[in-house]
């Protein structure tokens, strides 16, 4: 599980504010979602995907276990006047909602096995897993086994379980701006592996 710190929150917020990544990702997800859906953005981090999805769904529950990360989302919701997103501080892998979600989005969150277990318990409809393909991934907050978190590995898990799915590859840019040279050093220390 990703560990948030003051530095990682700041780096992610700076990057999210300077890219259209979440809007482009939302455009890729929309064909699988309905405007009437109550969507769970599972492991939402700072919630920028929830913000992008908010104008396309009835309600978004933005679930994240780190209160500091969710505070960024709360600030953005207030600043933008968005009322249909509910931040929820919880471990989504252990959470059981009162009513199952219409759809769940897992964006760079959890193993495929964790996603399947959570979705089975929490979702009655569409499950979307946005998987980073480690073949192209250069930085990581923790060591990863080569290929373990790849597009092909995710498809392999679904195939092994006999779960029907639609797969789509996409390449979206997510640049990281730095305020100072020291920021760049800190970033590379954290994510350089």
Predicted regions and their residues:
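Class I SAM-dependent methyltransferase "Motif I" SAM/SAH-binding loop
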Residues: 43-47
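Conserved beta-strand signature within the Rossmann-like core of class I S-adenosyl-L-methionine
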Residues: 124-137
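Class I SAM-dependent methyltransferase Rossmann-like catalytic core
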Residues: 6-20
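Conserved alpha-helix/loop element of class I SAM-dependent methyltransferases that forms part
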Residues: 19-36
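A short, conserved alpha-helix within the catalytic core of class I
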Residues: 110-122
């Amino acid at each position: 599980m990703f560990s948030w710190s003051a530095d990682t929150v700041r780096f992610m917020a700076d990057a999210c504010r300077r890219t259209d990544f979440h809007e482009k990702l939302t455009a890729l997800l929309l064909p699988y979602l309905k405007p009437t859906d109550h969507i769970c953005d599972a492991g939402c981090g700072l919630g920028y995907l929830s913000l992008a999805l908010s104008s396309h769904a009835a309600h978004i529950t933005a679930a994240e276990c780190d209160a500091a990360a969710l505070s960024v989302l709360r600030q953005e919701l207030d600043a933008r006047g968005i009322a249909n997103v509910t931040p929820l501080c919880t471990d989504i892998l252990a959470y059981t909602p009162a009513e199952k979600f219409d759809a769940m989005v897992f964006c760079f969150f959890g193993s495929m096995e964790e996603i399947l277990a959570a979705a089975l318990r929490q979702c009655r409809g569409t499950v979307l897993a946005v998987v980073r393909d480690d073949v192209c991934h250069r930085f990581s907050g923790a060591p990863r086994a080569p290929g373990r978190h790849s597009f092909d590995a995710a498809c392999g898990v679904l195939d092994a379980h006999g779960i029907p799915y639609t797969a789509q590859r996409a390449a979206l840019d997510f640049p990281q701006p730095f305020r100072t040279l020291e920021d760049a050093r800190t970033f590379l220390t954290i994510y350089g592996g």
